[in-house]
């Protein structure tokens, strides 16, 4: 059962940014998760609430709208948790990519929505051509490229369109808002090298909160969003 409530045992969970706009989106996500079992229909139903958050001004703190030169993501990319369900079933975060910088090619492993709050991004989406049995290699081809402007967003329904990278094409850093059905920066996902076909496990981490380290777990590489 998803934990969208307010009783959390650690300050790194729950509403890290507690504003009416964020609470409204999380409440609507909780309602639709209860009432709409079909993932595609649920994501579609979330579009109005997500669009409202993207169009609202003043709710994102300046501290979570800046590049992070010390981030394990590299490239000055900041990834800031805004809300995290204690059971790992949902997160909301901002991704700040400096002008001209880009993320590695990566996946998300969760349904959700991603939209641009400030600036402009180019997204390149990949299609996987192999059957995925070899965890260390993948054959990818570009499925599409498009520009995402402020207020525009797209959906994730893995495995469809789950592998991509984004690049800031505005003169100032871009900020995208991500609502995803896992604890994205703390789960082990995949980073891809389309040229060589190499796939590597990675965990991007947040810039403002720490991921819990399971006992005896190996540390994974950083990068992605």
Q: What are the language-model segments listed below?
A:
Residues 1-58:
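N-terminal leader/capping segments at the start of a protein or of a new domain
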Residues 73-99, 153:
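A short glycine-rich, His/Asp/Glu-containing loop-to-beta-strand
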Residues 93-107, 157-161:
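Conserved short histidine dyad/triad with adjacent acidic residue
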Residues 110-129:
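Glycine- and acidic-residue-biased ligand/ion/polar-headgroup-sensing regions
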Residues 113-115, 171-186:
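A short hydrophobic beta-strand segment most commonly corresponding to one strand
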Residues 128-163, 205:
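Short acidic-glycine-tyrosine-enriched beta hairpin
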Residues 158-177:
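Ligand-binding loop in jelly-roll beta-barrel domains
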Residues 192-225:
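Long hydrophobic alpha-helical segments typical of transmembrane helices together
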């Amino acid at each position: 059962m998803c934990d969208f409530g307010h009783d959390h045992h650690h300050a790194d969970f729950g509403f890290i940014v507690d504003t009416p706009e964020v609470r409204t989106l999380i409440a609507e996500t909780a309602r639709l998760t209860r009432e709409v079992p079909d993932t595609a229909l649920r994501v579609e139903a979330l579009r109005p609430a997500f669009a409202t958050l993207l169009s609202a001004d003043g709710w994102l703190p300046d501290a979570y709208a800046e590049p992070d030169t010390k981030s394990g993501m590299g490239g000055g990319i900041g990834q800031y948790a805004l809300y995290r369900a204690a059971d790992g079933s949902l997160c909301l975060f901002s991704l700040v990519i400096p002008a001209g910088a880009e993320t590695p090619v990566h996946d998300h492993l969760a349904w959700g929505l991603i939209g641009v709050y400030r600036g402009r991004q180019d997204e390149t989406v990949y299609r996987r051509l192999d059957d995925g049995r070899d965890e260390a290699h993948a054959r990818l081809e570009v499925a599409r490229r498009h520009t995402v402007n402020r207020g525009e967003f797209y959906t994730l329904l893995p495995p469809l369109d789950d592998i991509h990278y984004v690049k800031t094409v505005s003169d100032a850093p871009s900020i995208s808002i991500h609502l995803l059905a896992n604890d994205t920066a703390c789960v082990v996902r995949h980073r891809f090298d389309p040229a060589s076909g190499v796939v590597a496990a990675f965990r991007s981490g947040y810039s403002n909160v720490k991921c819990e380290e399971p006992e005896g777990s190996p540390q994974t590489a950083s990068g992605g969003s």
